[in-house]
């Protein structure tokens, strides 16, 4: 689990989350939109940890209180990750894991937070079931949907959520992070960041992938090698 200061970029989003934690005024339903690997899940986890943090400090999550330690180990009883066993997230899974348990008050925290990654995988029936829950949630209930394809979600779902747009980071920021955390040569960090186009998750995978390095070298060779036509021209005798 990261603190807000350890998460790269997304400064405005982090400021909004920290204000919601500080003022104790989170929205009841969030929709985190952005491509896979851009940082949605990392910030969702940190946001949930900060909301549940028991520290008196303004710098939350503290990583030291009981709740933060539970978050670190994945055992915080009032932060629930909604999972699926099949390609889609069906109505029965949404009802069993979220809708039917929302009315049960938090066990030991101020909020009951549900995190739904890949929310675009929800069937229409599942979305309609969720809609009824987020239309009239209990005071302590918070749902955070994460998606890389917002158009797959019903307009009624979108309209009842606070949409948070996760945009690509600058190539320089991604390159610096990869260089520091992946311990790769400068040229490899630079190439990984360039090919990732601002997606930190992709850049990290590229930096650690031997297959990517080989493909990148092959592509660079194709661009730098002379074409057959150029080679033919180079062999032609120059005119007197």
Regions found by a protein language model. Give the residues of each.
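Charged, glycine-rich active-site and insertion segments that engage polyanionic ligands
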Residues: 1-50, 70, 139-140, 149-225, ...
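Conserved adenine-binding aromatic site and its adjacent loop/helix in ATP-hydrolyzing domains
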Residues: 100, 132, 155, 159
């Amino acid at each position: 689990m990261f603190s807000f200061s350890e998460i790269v970029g997304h400064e405005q989003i982090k400021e909004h989350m920290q204000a919601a934690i500080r003022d104790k005024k989170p929205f009841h339903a969030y929709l985190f939109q952005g491509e896979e690997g851009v940082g949605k899940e990392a910030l969702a986890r940190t946001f949930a940890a900060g909301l549940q943090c028991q520290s008196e400090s303004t710098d939350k999550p503290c990583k030291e209180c009981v709740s933060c330690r539970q978050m670190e180990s994945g055992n915080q009883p009032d932060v629930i990750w909604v999972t699926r066993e099949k390609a889609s997230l069906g109505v029965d899974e949404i009802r069993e894991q979220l809708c039917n348990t929302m009315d049960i008050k938090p066990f030991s925290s101020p909020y009951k937070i549900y995190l739904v990654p890949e929310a675009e995988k929800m069937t229409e029936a599942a979305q309609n079931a969720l809609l009824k829950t987020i239309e009239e949630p209990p005071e302590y209930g918070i749902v955070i949907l994460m998606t890389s394809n917002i158009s797959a979600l019903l307009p009624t779902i979108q309209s009842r959520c606070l949409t948070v747009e996760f945009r690509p980071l600058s190539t320089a920021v991604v390159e610096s992070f990869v260089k520091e955390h992946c311990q790769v040569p400068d040229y490899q960090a630079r190439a990984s960041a360039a090919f990732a186009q601002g997606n930190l998750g992709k850049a990290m995978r590229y930096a650690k992938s031997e297959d990517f390095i080989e493909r990148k070298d092959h592509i660079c060779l194709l661009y730098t090698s002379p074409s057959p036509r150029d080679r033919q021209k180079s062999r032609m005798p120059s005119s007197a």
